[in-house]
Amino acid sequence: MKRKLGHEPDEDIFNIFCYDLKTLDSLINMINDYDKKKLPPKRQRRYYPSKMHLLPDILSDLEELNKMTGLKKFKIQLLEQILFFIQDIDEKIMLHTVLEGPPGTGKTTVAGILSKIYAKIGIFKKVKFNVLKRSDLISEYLGGTTIKTTKALDRCKKGVVLIDEAYSIGSTSGEDIYAKECVDTINQYLTENYDKIVCIIAGYKQELDRCFFSINPGLRRRFPWTFTIDNYSSNELAEIFYKIVKEKEWETTCKESDIIDIINKKHNLFTGNGGDITSIVEKSMINNCRKNFGKEQKYTIELDDFIHAMNIFEDNKKGKLNNVPYGMYN
């Protein structure tokens, strides 16, 4: 509940014109001020966006997203989407979204945060988020895919559904009749239920175009929003390294400059992005435990542990590692 306007200094009164909303940071700052400062009289607020009052509800979700490493382009694209919808310009525009990006860049996490934002800005009454994959949609019997896909989407109604790695549904040849049946069903379902479900498709841009959208030419029109998630830079991968070490309640003596330098020299190998860093941290931990077997000096990753893990990672990527017990480094 906002306090009534009295004789307060101008800096204590919210002024919507003071904010240059070009980044997610700027939007978060504005929402914080809107939530905490006194509002001007109603006559001065008549041009405020009609859903302005809902912004504080998504503040924690925006802050969670903003803390994620990287995602610079995506964060700007999301800012633009939010600013559009809180102005209530056109409620008929569908929210079906494409998340284009490589593995290990947090697409599933991002989709989950999007589901909370969509619910809280009035798209749905409560947060509901489901993830579907090919096995949830494709039947082993001809004609059964329509039924299976429809039932799967019915379970996701009144919420957000993520079809992860959607390109796996189809093939480059376009001759998979089961995939055709599935994609046609998705297209029809989204058309008939445009206000009852939000569908997010995630995967590589080229593979999505070749193996998913090409199956039904009208499907792309159902997805008016396309967000791009880029590969992580060397600096961002290093940042993720330290985050994962902390999450595992370990420590490290590795200098950030050394980590960045080593990653930068092999940056082309990091096709799995954050997933690759997780693997390297775990390999580093394994090496640290081996060399400190029976000693107290554990739980601290040193530079030689990281280098050892990087060498194994590189060999794995290049297919040179042999005679290693299955699953040891996967």
What are the residue ranges of the model-derived segments?
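C-terminal engagement/docking regions of AAA+ P-loop ATPases
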Residues: 291-330
